[in-house]
Amino acid sequence: MAAYAGPTSVSFQPDEDVMTAHLENWFGECMEGEIDIGWSDPITGGIKSFKRFDVGDFDEAATFAARVNAIPGQSVYFRPAVIRLGSKRYVTDDDAQYVPGVWCDMDDEGAAEKARTIYSTCQPTSVVVTGRKPYIRAHLYWKFSEPVTAGS
């Protein structure tokens, strides 16, 4: 990713209530494990770090995510899989405990605009627009009726 070259201050803030609702919708049926909130470095554009929260601490995770996302140029996201308790700082697929559903990132130019033709027969449970400049980017989520044990 390229370094951030946008404004250094903004007049709006992330919506913590929407973040809480999205985390609760996605992880609400998961009873154990942890949620990873990650964020990018506005200087390099690369992943800076992760902070882990109990899978039921939606408010705390959203408060943290909103605070991090309020810094211009610093993107925040969550890992859509529940991480096994006691996992090391940097995880791999083997550290996933549950997956509440399937998801995809539409981060390439033009992908979000074409998505409707791709999912016309199977609408996603939720869509998050992750950016609009220089082009629209989105994440699509299809939630299962219950979480699936990772690797099964």
State where each predicted segment sits.
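Short, conserved phosphate-binding/catalytic loop or strand-edge motifs used
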Residues: V129-K143
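Detector for short helical micro-motifs
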Residues: V102-C104, L140
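Short, surface-exposed ligand-recognition loops at beta-strand->loop->(often short) alpha-helix junctions
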Residues: D105-A112
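DNA replication initiation on ssDNA origins
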Residues: M1-G101, E113
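A general structural motif
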Residues: V99, P124, Y135-R137
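Helical (often loop-to-helix) elements that flank the catalytic cores of nucleotide-handling enzymes
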Residues: A112-C122, F144-S152
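A short acidic (Asp/Glu
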Residues: K88-T92, A138, W142, G151-S152
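Catalytic micro-motifs at enzyme active sites that drive phosphoryl/nucleotidyl and oxygen chemistry
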Residues: S87-D94, A115-K133
